[in-house]
Amino acid sequence: MWYRTFRTLGYTICRPYATCATKAERFVKTIDPSTLPRGYLVSSTYAGIKNAIRPVTSTNEPSAATTNVPHPQEAPKPDVALIVSSVPAAIAGTFTTNVFKAAPVVHATTALKAAGPNARVRAILTNSGCANAVTGQQGLEDTQTLVNRVQALLSPRNQNAIPTYEQDARSSSTDVLMMSTGVIGVRLPVAHIQRCLEHLAAPSILQSHPDAWLEAARAYMTTDTFPKIRTRQFILGNRRCSIVGIDKGAGMIHPRMTRSGGQLHATLLGVFATDAPISSATLQRCLDEAVRVSFNCISVDGDMSTNDTILALANGQAPFVDLDCTDTPNEWTETEHPDMVNKFAEELKSLCIEMSHLIVRDGEGAEKFVQVHVRNAGTYEQAHAIASSISTSALVKCAMHGEDANWGRILCSAGYASLPASTPAWTLDPSKVNVTFLPPPHQPDDLAPLPTLVNGVPQAVNETQAKKLLSYEDIYVDVDLQGGSWGSQGRSEATYWTCDFSKEYITVRW
């Protein structure tokens, strides 16, 4: 068994941010077609969803994708996308824990639960502009209507026998799942979307080339300023495997997702499609861990969406490296192929972390990317809670925007963090806390770490050094709890990523 990664994670250090290229110019990367997973086709189109729902939305509320309104000479941004696997693919998902779950979230979680650990899907339909959230039973029926239509189009022999909502609700079919993002409290314009589906599902329209994937990523966008898509390719055993990831998000970002078990808008959506031969149950466990340390560790504004969804598909179509040796198992499982699964899980986790960073960098009005690393806590959950509290503090975020090394705000937000219980009980010890600002990795200047608090005691701060450190777009904050009440037994750590609050955030959200 051997293993090699073909792509490495790059760093973008840019200072001062005012002199940088646009986010789209910096973060939209050319996709190498050879790194796209085998056995997937995508399509996208403009259905006019925003225009269709505009009469029932507030004129003062920016519709989803306000920042992406096309110039009169430009083609409108696509707002519906379809991803299709050539064979039924293993499926895994994590979903918002918001009580007001949107209709597509309810549909997906119900379908996956009914299908059990061997769930399979053929396609993912996604729309932007309307969240289909807080729309009651009618919202569920609208989702099912569109899912049924896509399923029928992908199975031409069944086009004359499309099941009714009641019939499909009794089945455990997960052939098609749907994701939605946009304005809350407004019904999907089903007719507008439905009339595009035959076009989207046409063999002549479904494509696998990079431009098609990029357009699909654009269809996911709401207040995003650039499409977010990355690929990874690696060899596992005798298979050359690939993963493509698409996600979106810029506002209403503070996910806390788990597996299935007013005029606000925006959300976090993501799809990761791989050709690796991974079973559904194993894929779910890999996705759970990847999301735990990536998407569940970011925040833009502290607001959890009704629609947050990450889906992962695995269709097993990865090509063999050695064509004379094709006896690789159909699907890898943790019990029978632990090395393969562990290496795949690391690739998925690394890609999820990279994709989650793109959401933070594209946060509404964001001018700073802030990493908060909390270490030497009692448990991971406690370190995560403290890092989250710091990252969501409006005062901390404003200080980062003002390039102010305000350790007091960091300390304050750490002190009121809501800590999960542990046995024995663990508490933060104020006399042990260290707060240090670190220079960004690969920065061109010879900068040293800047301690602002040591053992709970404020330090004299070199303001010139502080200003230089915080003038970077990327700011790194290290909070060492030195074990707290557990002393040397407190060794857990967590990393969170957030952005600053700028005047532009208020403008976008007004």
UniProtKB/Swiss-Prot annotation:
Belongs to the ArgJ family. GO terms for molecular function: glutamate N-acetyltransferase activity; L-glutamate N-acetyltransferase activity. Heterodimer of an alpha and a beta chain. Its main location: mitochondrion. It comes from the Eukaryota. GO terms for biological process: L-arginine biosynthetic process; ornithine biosynthetic process. GO terms for cellular component: mitochondrial matrix. Its EC number is 2.3.1.35, 2.3.1.1. NCBIfam families: ArgJ, PRK05388.1. Catalyzes two activities which are involved in the cyclic version of arginine biosynthesis: the synthesis of acetylglutamate from glutamate and acetyl-CoA, and of ornithine by transacetylation between acetylornithine and glutamate. The record marks A266, T267 as: Cleavage. This is Arginine biosynthesis bifunctional protein ArgJ, mitochondrial. It catalyses: N(2)-acetyl-L-ornithine + L-glutamate = N-acetyl-L-glutamate + L-ornithine; L-glutamate + acetyl-CoA = N-acetyl-L-glutamate + CoA + H(+). The active site is at T267 (nucleophile). Pathway: Amino-acid biosynthesis; L-arginine biosynthesis; L-ornithine and N-acetyl-L-glutamate from L-glutamate and N(2)-acetyl-L-ornithine (cyclic): step 1/1; Amino-acid biosynthesis; L-arginine biosynthesis; N(2)-acetyl-L-ornithine from L-glutamate: step 1/4. The record marks T181, G182 as: Involved in the stabilization of negative charge on the oxyanion by the formation of the oxyanion hole. The keyword Transferase applies. Residues 57-76 are annotated as: Disordered. Residues 57-70 have a biased composition (Polar residues). This protein may be expected to contain an N-terminal transit peptide but none has been predicted.
